[in-house]
Amino acid sequence: MGREFDQLFDQWALTYDDTVYGTDEQYKEVFSNYEEILDEVAKLSLGSVLEFGVGTGNLTKRLLNREHKVIGIEPSKEMRKIAKQKLPHLQIMEGDFLAYPKISEPIETIVSTYAFHHLTDEEKQTAIKRYANMLSTGNKIVFADTMFVSDQAKQEMIDQAKINQFHRLAEDLQTEYYTTLPILEEFFQLENFTVHFTKKNPFVWILEAVKK
């Protein structure tokens, strides 16, 4: 994963929480049911958790409240700063989905919300292979992110964003690496996971992959 988005996230850090809680009209549907989505990801998690893309710590707080041990990985310096202000005892390290410090302790769940789309499909597959090697039978990967049932469905959402004059959203959908459910399902099945998808809003699905 390139670090081309780091500057964007440093700039976004101070207003990120406002965006996810619905103050940005263009992203209102993307972040609809936000708290419910975070709650469900936390509920699906088991044991020791490795979280990629901690952001400002909104999911992390829920995981800690459920008494999970959490190791957080976050590329943005400003996001890490805000997360540490919210959660002073959080173990959070600089890194991303593909480049992160060595994790020496056993991990039972790997989680991420609104972030896996920063990887190309090739990078996604590489990441999933690595994570599969970290997990034992019954362990999980739980991701919530924008994804689509097909390329056609993705194009329809881009077209609708343009009709609504949501130009930032349309550009985002065209320039980030949002993928499809069949592609993700194949990547996980190749690494011996069973996969289940749950739709949470017009954009976001929760992916739960359990290691066989």
Stretch-by-stretch model annotation:
Residues 1-44:
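Conserved class I S-adenosyl-L-methionine
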Residues 52, 56-99:
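Class I SAM-dependent methyltransferase SAM/SAH-binding core
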Residues 99-105:
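Short amphipathic alpha-helix with an adjacent loop that forms part of the alpha/beta core around
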Residues 111:
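A conserved beta-strand element that flanks and buttresses the S-adenosyl-L-methionine
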Residues 114-115:
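Short catalytic micro-motifs in class I SAM-dependent methyltransferases
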Residues 125-137:
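A short glycine-rich, Lys/Arg-flanked "PGG" loop and its adjoining helix->strand segment in the class I
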Residues 144-191, 196-198:
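C-terminal alpha-helical "lid/dimerization" subdomain adjacent to the S-adenosyl-L-methionine
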Residues 191-212:
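Core SAM-dependent methyltransferase catalytic element
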